[in-house]
Amino acid sequence: MSASLIRRGLELLEAPGQGKAPPALQQGRDGTRPAGTARRRKVTAGPGKNKATIKGRVVKSAIEEYHKKKAVNHLKANLLYMTSGRCVADKAVTQQVLTQNRGRKSKDRPAEKKEKKKPEGTVFTEEDFRKFEREYFGIP
């Protein structure tokens, strides 16, 4: 890992409200370094503008992103909303909605009653058949 990633991670983990110690209280190393290095270190140490990013881009905090996407429980707000408004619709409106939604699927329709077939009776009587037999077959 690079030093900048570690530094950024430590900045995320430090408690909010706790900043860096003032420069007078920071423990410094021996002062044998050239003046240019100390100046460069002071410039990069502050939480200033990150020069390594694209122009206009803001560096996002991972913790803030996590809190944005964390699941929120809306139960209390929903219960309050549902219980506060006791608006009951008219009977005619509810009946109209029910009739519009009913009967579109075949399973919602009541079964049609089939008519019972009556046994087919003959129009002719037994006497008519005998008469026909005599005429057709010639049986006396």
Swiss-Prot record:
Keyword field contains Transit peptide: no
Taxonomy, superkingdom: Eukaryota
CC annotations in GO: nucleolus; nucleoplasm; small-subunit processome
Single GO BP term: ribosomal small subunit biogenesis
Annotated localization: Nucleus, Nucleolus
Keyword line: Nucleus
Leader peptide range in chain numbering: none
Residue ranges, annotated region (Disordered): 1-52, 95-123
Ranges of biased composition (kind: Basic and acidic residues): 108-120
Keyword Nucleus assigned: yes
GO molecular function list: enzyme binding
Function: Part of the small subunit (SSU) processome, first precursor of the small eukaryotic ribosomal subunit. During the assembly of the SSU processome in the nucleolus, many ribosome biogenesis factors, an RNA chaperone and ribosomal proteins associate with the nascent pre-rRNA and work in concert to generate RNA folding, modifications, rearrangements and cleavage as well as targeted degradation of pre-ribosomal RNA by the RNA exosome. Acts as a chaperone that specifically mediates the integration of RPS19 in state post-A1. Direct regulator of SIRT1.
Subunit architecture: Part of the small subunit (SSU) processome, composed of more than 70 proteins and the RNA chaperone small nucleolar RNA (snoRNA) U3.
Family statement drawn from the similarity comment of this UniProt entry: Belongs to the AROS family.
Name the UniProt record assigns to this protein: Active regulator of SIRT1
Organism of provenance: Gallus gallus
